[in-house]
Structures are given as C-alpha cells and as structure tokens.
C-alpha cells in the first residue's frame, strides 16, 4: 500500500485557512485544497488546534470558530486530517 504524503500544519497554517480576512487566506486555502486533492494527509497536534481555536475566538465570530472546529473534527473522523496527541 502506498504511503500518503504528510505535511505538518501549525497554528499559522490553520489560522490562514480559517480566517477569511487574513493576508494569506487565499494562498493557504489553495495549498490546502491542492494538497488534499493530491491525496495528502495534513498532520497537526491537539496543542496546535487549541492555540488555533483560541486565536480564532479573538479574531473571528463565534460562528466562524465553530465552523472551523466542526470542519477539523469531521476531517479527523473521515481520516482526512491526523491529530497527534501531545503528552509531555
């Protein structure tokens, strides 16, 4: 079985994708879309997502933050995003 290409997404990557008014939103969204279409697997951590959600709460609407959370969780359940749990 062929291994999927993986890229680690940090806070700023997720923020650029989720924050539509951000300077890099279009560029980050295009990269993410092309990466997914090519069969790539985004990898991130629970700590990264916590930081991203905290920043989104201060920069976007509650609905925008909720949409991001729901999207990430759905992608994780569908094996389209891998979330690593950080332990010490």
Model-derived segments and their meaning:
Residues 15, 50-53:
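Amphipathic alpha-helical segments within well-ordered protein domains
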């Amino acid at each position: 079985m062929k291994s999927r290409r993986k890229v680690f997404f940090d806070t700023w990557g997720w923020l650029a994708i989720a924050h539509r008014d951000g300077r890099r939103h279009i560029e980050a969204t295009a990269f993410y879309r092309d990466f997914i279409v090519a069969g790539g697997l985004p990898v991130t951590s629970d700590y990264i997502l916590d930081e991203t959600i905290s920043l989104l709460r201060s920069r976007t609407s509650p609905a925008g933050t909720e949409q991001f959370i729901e999207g990430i969780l759905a992608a994780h359940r569908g094996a389209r995003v891998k979330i690593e749990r950080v332990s010490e």
